[in-house]
Curated annotation (Swiss-Prot):
Protein name from the UniProt record: Mitochondrial import inner membrane translocase subunit TIM12
Record keyword Zinc present: yes
Annotated Gene Ontology cellular component terms: mitochondrial inner membrane; mitochondrial intermembrane space protein transporter complex; mitochondrion; TIM22 mitochondrial import inner membrane insertion complex
Superkingdom of origin: Eukaryota
Modified residues (N-acetylserine): 2
Main localization of the protein described in the UniProt heading: mitochondrion
UniProt-listed Gene3D superfamilies: Mitochondrial import inner membrane translocase subunit tim13 like domains (1.10.287.810)
Domain free text: The twin CX3C motif contains 4 conserved Cys residues that form 2 disulfide bonds in the mitochondrial intermembrane space. However, during the transit of TIM12 from cytoplasm into mitochondrion, the Cys residues probably coordinate zinc, thereby preventing folding and allowing its transfer across mitochondrial outer membrane.
Entry keyword set: Acetylation, Disulfide bond, Membrane, Metal-binding, Mitochondrion, Mitochondrion inner membrane, Protein transport, Translocation, Transport, Zinc
Subcellular location: Mitochondrion inner membrane; Mitochondrion intermembrane space
Keyword Acetylation: yes
């Protein structure tokens, strides 16, 4: 976000295309974060009654390991996808219709 608010580049305008890309990146990051949160919560925190207000040492270690593994695998898969040149515009024929619909929906707001 500092890219958009950087005072050193005050004369530079931000294009709508860059804002759209930033929005897609934010949505992807938010989705990844929520996926990590729900997966690690399900795996590491017991569902029965909570005896303590804080996490136990075992729960903390479990969450740390879980988040590290999820982050590592996400980076590994992302790197693989980038090296293979996979992109929605190449492999997903309906992507351009999706992007056009998203932009149209956003402009109505």
């Amino acid at each position: 976000m500092s890219f958009f608010l950087n005072s050193l580049r005050g004369n530079q305008e931000v294009s709508q295309e860059k804002l759209d890309v930033a929005g897609v990146q934010f949505d992807a990051m938010c989705s990844t974060f929520n996926n990590i949160l729900s997966t690690c919560l399900e795996k590491c925190i017991p569902h029965e009654g909570f005896g303590e207000p804080d996490l136990t040492k075992g729960e903390q270690c479990c969450i740390d390991r879980c988040v590290a593994k999820m982050h590592y695998s996400n980076r590994l898969i992302g790197g693989f996808v980038q090296t293979r040149g996979f992109g929605p515009e190449n492999q997903l024929r309906h992507y351009s219709r999706f992007v056009a619909k998203e932009i149209a929906d956003d402009s109505k707001k």
